[in-house]
Amino acid sequence: MQANSVPEFGYIPGGTVNDVARSLGIPNNIRGALKVILTGKNVLLDCMKINDRYAMYIVAAGAFTSATYTTPQAQKKLVGRVAYGIEGIRNNLKFDVFNVKIEGKDAVAESESVLVLFMNGKYVAGMGLNRHASMTDGKIEVAIVRQRPRPNFLHRVGAYFVLAKLFLLGYRVKERRIEKLEGSHFEVTAGEGVVWNFDGERGLSGKVVVDVLPGKVNMIVPARKKDF
């Protein structure tokens, strides 16, 4: 990220859900992706810097977020993204509650939470969670799913419905238990037990600083694609 010139990237999807490809309109098959590389256009996309690490489209902690790196590879190949749901339900039925404080330029949010998302892409886990967003606007969207410090059974059931609304209806859903922020710089305070997921891989734990790096990824995208 310190280079004077921005290297050019062609993208061939090889993952389970291929969220970046979905966001950019790149076909999931190799032949289609290669055609984009040969005939497409260049767009400078934003990415995120988290302390000294980087992520393209998602930084997350809490419910279901460990499923992407704990799901056995054989299970992924067998049932695809359904494997994430199976693994998530198996390991996260109770949804651990954790305290998080997020300080942005214009707002501060602090609460007990079951899920925190920093989103730069339109898709998360194969779902159009943030489909109205842009990967070229210099900002990211943050969603915090709040929970009581000591939730009872009904509170936990309620969390399932809130999470379902968020993933099915998207970031713009009106829900009082989902706090939302937007910006380009966030300082995040969380306990060391809070593990952050960077683009589907296990990342850092605890306190992090999340910054948007505008236009740092020079990606070849479909020539007719206009919305990034």
Predicted regions mapped to residue ranges:
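Glycine-rich phosphate/pyrophosphate-binding beta-alpha loops
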Residues: 60, 64, 117-131, 202
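ATP/nucleoside-binding phosphotransfer catalytic cores, i.e., glycine-rich phosphate-binding loops
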Residues: 104-106, 110, 134, 144-228
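Residue-level signal for tight coil/turn positions that link beta-strands
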Residues: 51-52, 137, 214
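Gly/Ser/Thr-rich active-site loops/lids in small-molecule metabolic enzymes
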Residues: 75-83, 128, 132-154
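Short acidic/glycine-rich loop or secondary-structure boundary segments that cap or lie
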Residues: 65-67, 110-111, 124-127, 150-154
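Catalytic core of DAGKc-family lipid kinases
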Residues: 2-117
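Glycine-rich nucleotide phosphate-binding loop and flanking beta-alpha elements
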Residues: 18, 123-124, 194
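Short beta-strand-to-turn element immediately C-terminal to the catalytic PLP-Schiff-base lysine
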Residues: 50, 70, 119, 143-145, ...
